[in-house]
Each structure stands twice: as structure tokens, then as C-alpha cells.
């Protein structure tokens, strides 16, 4: 089965066919760096990092570009409030961005272009649109003639006659038509600006991504992605600008993730539930946050609350414990493993699980189903570990496959927080030890006791059951 992508432009799943065999050119809209990103921003970051990882796993050479908007009204306001320059604000929060997403195990982009470092390309694209009659100057501003682009609305499915722009596009008397949107803003007194043929000023939001995608990926790209809130007007405007300028298709596939809600409500400052990723990471394992984000298909809304995060923590721990148990069994190999008579059957099961995982990811990157398959792998690993005799070959294959699944999903199976086990991990091992003893697999029961002893955890078998204390 080939990779299937739900293409927002076509409103259906389509088989992925790259523009060039073996290569994927992918652009994801990045943050406006005037503050810490909110937890909702982390969803597209994690989702499309995972999409990229899977393409890499399938053998594609992925060129991944994600920008920083480092000048706009919000940055100017933040600079005034913090008594800093706009570049100083941008530098501060770009650094904070990398600090946060590095914890989430997000791979580095091929390029993270900053708007302010690519102003020549932005100005050139605006000039091209003016030359072709798709844009016009008005009192130092430059606007795009929306109605001249006949395909406008094709991404969002809206008709020109019914369109109403969102908050980022304001009506003013300088426009020839209320649907026209800004490409270049004339400088106001005291604001940062760049020189251009249209006068001193700075770019509008939408033109930035068109120019950066063109510079780093070319006139046509394979995949353009972002949150569903960007479909209109941002991505709709990008299509209009880019295709008007080049006469070519801007992006072949458009991918959009659904919203993250806080306790069932959309996150917003007015509701008082606006949470930054930076704050969430202070109290939560980033590995758990990543697992949580991938536990629901990216096109479905996801809800964040303490109970759901606890479920994610427990789900991830089950995978980690299975992995660590297998690894420990291999590391403590004393040469007493025997050739287990059903080795071929177990290896065949592993092959089937690998195929199931690939089928899940091929189906529009269904990480929720992929995690279910991952848990089935861990379950079978635990069953195998409880056997009296095992094959080192099967153990190594279990370990290799768990690493493979984790790498695609960007999860870490080692204990990343501390070398010690928390109470739930200890209790899971105690339960596994009890099962081993009931099955008269005393070698495995003793092995679990040794694992816990290495972590300074002492077991005490009592009439009421097994208790533990930390040494």
C-alpha cells in the first residue's frame, strides 16, 4: 500500500506521488516569535515532524522548511512592552522555541528561515505581482487584487461572492476592494522598516511564506502543512500570491491538523485557558506530551486535561517497561539461552506487526492506530519474556522493532527523566513478577527482583502481598 494523504485541496485521501522520485519537499508554517508558543502550536510541530520521520523511514530524502515570522505587529508591541528592539525579542523567543521543541525530540528542519533575513526575495515577489497586474500600490501600502485570481477560495471551498476575511485582514479606504489583502505595509513613525521600491515598510504576513517556500523549495512543492486555522485566509492567500506570480501549482498536497482543546474548550485568552508549551514542560515529561499528541489522529480534535495526560503517561510507561525488560534480558545474557522451538513463529508475528504498523502510517499517518500496534508489540514481548526458555534472536528482533517504531514516532523508550523508577513502573514490574511466579517461571521472577535491586528498590513478600521500599 502506498502512502495515502488527506489533501485539504481535494477534500479526500490521495496516494502520495512526489514531484521527483525519492524526494519530498515540505513546508510547514512556523511561529510568530513574540512570546513562548502555546501548547496548541505544539500539535502541528509534533505531527508534521512525525510525518517527516515516516517519509524518511520509507526511504525519501525530505527537505523540510519551517519559517520564523520575526517582524509583525505583535513583535512590535512586545518590543515596546519589554523595552527591547524587535530583533532582540525575536532572538529571545526563537531561542526559547528551540529549547522547548528540542525537549519534544523534534528533528531540526533543513532550514528555519527568518523573514527579516529574506527581505530581498519578499520584495521581488511583490514586484512580480505588481508587474503582472495582481497587486497595486496605495499610499505606501501594496495590496493583492483578490478578485483577479479566479481560483481564489479553492482551498477553503468558499466562493468569492461569499468571502469574509478573518481578523488578520482589515478593511481600509486604501483598498480598491474590501477583499484585497496586504502584501506590504507602509512604515509608521518609530517602527522598524525596510527600504523597497514601494517605500519604507515591512511585509504582510501571507507574502512571507510564499517567498520563503519559493526560495528554499522552488515554485512547486510536494506538501504544505499547518493547523486548520491557517486554511483561510493564510493558506488561501499563499496560493493566490504564489500561483499568480509563477503560473504554476504552488503545492500538490495540503495537510492540516485539527485543534487542541483544553477540557473540551478551544484554547483562548478570553477563556483564561491559554497555556504555553514552556509552562506545560515545567510539570510534564516531554516524552509524555509527544505521546499524547500522537494518540489521536491529527485530523481529529484532541483534548488536554490532567486525566488524559495521566492516561498518556501510563500508556507510554507500558511501552518503556517492555522495552527496558527486553534490553535488560539481552544485556544480562549469560549464555544459557536455548534455541526456542517456536522461534520462526515468533519472528513471523513480528513481521506481521511491522506490516501492520506501516499500514497504519500509510493510512494518512494514523499515529493513533500505530500506537495501538505498538502496544500489541509490547504485549507480545511481555508474553515472550514470561516463557521459561527464549531465543536471543527473537529478543533482539523485539528490541529492534520497538526501537524502529519509537524512532518513527519520535518517542524515547529509555527512562529520560531519571535512572530511578517511579511507583507505577515499580508496581507494573511487581505484577509481572507475580505472574511469572504463578507460572512457575522462577528465573524470570528472580530477574525482575534483580532489576529492581539495581534501582535500589527492595521487595518484601508478605502475607498481604509484595510491598516495596526504596533503599
Swiss-Prot record:
Pfam families assigned to the protein according to its UniProt record, in alphabetical order: DALR_2 (PF09190), tRNA-synt_1e (PF01406)
GO molecular function ontology, one term from the record: cysteine-tRNA ligase activity
Example of a GO biological process term: cysteinyl-tRNA aminoacylation
Alphabetized Gene3D superfamilies for the sequence: Cysteine-tRNA ligase, C-terminal anti-codon recognition domain, HUPs
Protein name listed in UniProt: Cysteine--tRNA ligase
Residues involved in ATP binding: 269
Amino acids binding Zn(2+): 29, 209, 234, 238
Signal sequence, start to end: none
Subcellular locations according to the entry: Cytoplasm
Keywords of this entry: Aminoacyl-tRNA synthetase, ATP-binding, Cytoplasm, Ligase, Metal-binding, Nucleotide-binding, Protein biosynthesis, Zinc
Motif ('HIGH' region): 31-41
Principal EC category: ligase
